[in-house]
Regions:
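Short beta-strand-centered aromatic/proline hotspots
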Residues: 101-113
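Residue-level signal for glycine
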Residues: 29, 98-100
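Hydrophobic beta-strand residues in large extracellular and virion-surface proteins
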Residues: 21-25, 67-71, 85-89, 106-108, ...
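Juxtamembrane "anchor/assembly" segments of surface/extracellular structural proteins
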Residues: 1-80, 116, 123-129, 135-138, ...
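Charged- and aromatic-enriched interaction segments used to assemble
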Residues: 97, 112-209
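Residues that flank catalytic or metal-binding motifs in active/ligand-binding sites
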Residues: 65, 104, 196
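Short coil-to-beta transition motif at edge beta-strands of beta-rich domains
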Residues: 77-95
């Protein structure tokens, strides 16, 4: 969890809140395009995140967060495929200042241009786990499987080994039967989440939590 001030916590509880977004786009080639609140088309920005697909609690869910935004920008859309988008939320406090909170990192999946605007759709690092899994002879506890998945998909892990082993069934030995319907590393996370009695989402530093 990202640390915030007492003033921030108080402002969050108010009936009306004043906040704004800033961020930057970094292409795979390392070119950085910062943008500020005034660059964002009013009403265009959104972040959708969830931990279950219905009104009921579901164990083992592995949902990716989606972000969409439209910018007043002349940036060429073609170099933006797979580009990294870092968003920050700025909440206005009682004294009139703004406190910044960084969001998870998103990767651009769609970039479209109009005459004056750039439309982006992006997802967080959870989609990196949509990679074919071939470790069907793997045996270990939940931590071993999570560590394997994160290293294979180049994603950090928010919890320590001690954190995972302290969870329900965290020290149980797990294995994958040869006959299974696992296709991707995301499927592995799904089953590990069920064993632990939880779900997975991206934490503030784009690490599964």
């Amino acid at each position: 969890m990202y640390p915030v001030s007492d003033a921030f916590l108080q402002a969050v509880q108010e009936n009306t809140r004043n906040y704004r977004w800033t961020g930057q786009i970094t292409t795979k080639g390392g070119v950085v395009y910062p943008f500020v609140y005034e660059d964002i088309v009013k009403g265009s920005g959104y972040v959708m995140a969830q931990c279950c697909g219905s009104a009921e609690i579901e164990l083992g869910t592995v949902y990716a967060a989606e972000m969409g935004i439209t910018l007043f920008s002349q940036i060429d859309r073609y170099p933006l495929e797979g580009a990294e988008v870092r968003l920050s939320s700025h909440l206005r406090l009682a004294d009139g200042s703004y406190e910044k909170v960084p969001m998870v990192i998103f990767e651009v999946s769609e970039a479209n241009r109009t005459a004056h605007c750039l439309e982006l759709k992006a997802y967080d690092y959870m989609l990196r786990f949509e990679k074919s899994f071939n470790g069907f002879e793997t045996v270990g506890n939940a931590w071993a499987f999570l560590d394997l998945c994160c290293k294979a998909c180049n994603v950090g892990l928010a919890h320590t080994q001690a954190d995972i082993e302290a969870m329900p069934n965290g020290t149980e030995l797990l294995s994958i039967y040869p006959e299974n319907d696992i296709e991707t590393y995301r499927d592995v996370l799904y089953f590990v989440g069920q064993v632990l009695g939880g779900f997975f989402c991206m934490a503030g530093k784009s690490s599964p939590s």
